[in-house]
């Protein structure tokens, strides 16, 4: 049996074992992509010098960050303080904005962008000059809640076309255990004509960015690193160690690092699902959930989770990557999927509860005007991806309610394109039957309960507060009908 049959990916080879391709490099066909493969294959034949930390520190070699969103851009800025960095994104508009000093994610200031020294580009050819490539692209789910690896596969193809021998490719995107070696490595090998473990190496270091969090920033969160071999793990330990003051944790394998990332958010998802279920139970018992949690929280080992919508590109998505892999190997996960069902249904539950309150107050439902404050997936960020507020909007619309949505941070064009929602100005919201504070942006905290309630028409104001930002006693003293999760 051939060695290649025993080891489908050279990344799995025992240390020191080298695979030799008996086929000579293809002739020059005039196809630029094919010529790239030929050139890189010939470099491999000559023997590759693997990228070293000192090469990067002395700026003899460059680092590329592929994908300049909420994860990639802050990472690129931190790395650029110590290394030469190329920032690549396939969206020309995104590159133009960054070059002009504007970050629409609000994660990096204009001053930090201007002083970063990052070479921003949407030209993939620029990757050819980089020997350490960090891939930080989204890994969403599709309409069937299965992993959508197309952004990751596309990035791997792009990197592979321009991969130089001796390089290292490290992935930060959240994936199911095994994806780096089973999905990404074969693409890199195919597109480059190189062999993983012989001509290049790979690593995995899961992102832990929390959008909008100015306390738990990239440099203050322990970084997990892993490599396809020991030198690669050492390289990533050194590179990330330059930018992460909190410390580095070296996982024993890439699969361990992948699994660690996917369970971080799965654990949070399940705990929030428990709080959401408790909230629905206590609501039927006319018990305030937050009062219960505050009382229970006096015990030293009670975990401080709160009920709420679970959206965004992490917590509401990552569990499906794990359940997908579990089912692929013949195991049907019960608890994880149960938690997902509860959290995915919370938008409809909130909308239905609001409708009941309208009826209870003797107000119409069909034709009622309700204001929804906040559309992004979390407070103080402009990110609309996978926001669960849209579930509330759609459920209310199904009851015939006219929903007026306001968000001070969301891009109106994105809201229109993604969800068909027309954002309203705050001044245009008045005389409504009820107000639902869905996302507690700073603007709404500043407004306070009284000003929010003043948006309602004559009669007793109705305010729904998903984050529990206000006090029921204060609402009662002002004659406000108030509800919170």
Language-model features, listed with the residues they occupy:
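Structural/interface elements that position substrates and couple domains in central-metabolism enzymes
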Residues: 46-485
């Amino acid at each position: 049996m051939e060695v290649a049959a025993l080891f489908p990916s050279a990344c799995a080879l025992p240390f020191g074992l080298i695979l030799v391709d008996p086929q000579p490099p293809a002739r020059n066909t005039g196809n630029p992509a094919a010529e790239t493969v030929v050139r890189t294959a010939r470099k491999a034949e000559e023997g590759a010098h693997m990228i070293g930390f000192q090469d990067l520190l002395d700026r003899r070699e460059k680092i590329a960050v592929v994908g300049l969103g909420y994860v990639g851009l802050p990472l690129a800025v931190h790395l650029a303080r110590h290394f030469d960095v190329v920032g690549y994104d396939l969206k020309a508009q995104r590159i133009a904005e960054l070059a002009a000093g504007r970050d629409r994610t609000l994660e990096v200031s204009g001053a930090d962008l201007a002083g970063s020294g990052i070479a921003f580009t949407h030209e993939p050819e620029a990757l050819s000059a980089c020997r350490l490539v960090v891939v930080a692209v989204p890994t969403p789910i599709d309409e069937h809640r299965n992993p959508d690896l197309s952004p990751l596969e596309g990035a791997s193809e792009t990197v592979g076309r321009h991969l130089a021998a001796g390089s290292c490719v490290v992935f930060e995107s959240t994936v199911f255990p095994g994806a780096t070696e089973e999905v990404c490595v074969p693409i890199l090998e195919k597109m480059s004509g190189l062999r993983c473990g012989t001509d290049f190496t790979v690593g995995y270091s899961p992102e832990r960015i929390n959008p909008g969090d100015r306390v738990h920033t990239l440099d203050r969160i322990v970084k997990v690193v892993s490599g396809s071999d020991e030198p690669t793990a050492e390289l990533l330990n050194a590179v990330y160690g330059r930018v992460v003051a909190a410390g580095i944790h070296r996982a024993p394998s890439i699969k361990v690092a992948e699994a660690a990332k996917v369970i971080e958010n799965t654990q949070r998802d399940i705990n929030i699902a428990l709080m959401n279920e408790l909230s629905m139970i206590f609501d039927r018992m006319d018990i305030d959930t937050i009062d219960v949690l505050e009382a229970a929280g006096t015990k030293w080992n009670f975990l401080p989770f709160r009920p709420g919508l679970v959206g965004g590109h992490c917590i509401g998505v990552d569990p499906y990557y794990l359940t997908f892999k579990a089912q692929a190997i013949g195991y049907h996960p019960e608890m994880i999927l149960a938690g997902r069902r509860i959290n995915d249904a919370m938008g409809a539950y909130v909308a239905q509860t609001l409708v009941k309150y309208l009826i209870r107050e003797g107000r119409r439902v069909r034709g009622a005007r309700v204001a929804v404050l906040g559309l992004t997936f979390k407070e103080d960020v402009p990110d609309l991806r996978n926001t669960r507020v849209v579930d509330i909007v759609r459920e209310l619309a199904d009851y015939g309610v006219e929903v007026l949505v306001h968000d001070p941070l969301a891009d109106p064009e994105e809201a229109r394109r993604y969800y068909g929602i027309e954002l309203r100005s705050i001044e245009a919201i008045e005389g409504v039957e009820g107000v639902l504070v869905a996302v507690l942006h700073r603007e709404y905290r500043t407004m306070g309960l009284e000003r929010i309630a003043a948006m309602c028409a004559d009669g007793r104001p109705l305010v729904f507060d998903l984050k529990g930002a206000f006090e029921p006693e204060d609402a009662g003293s002002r004659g406000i009908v108030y509800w919170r999760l």
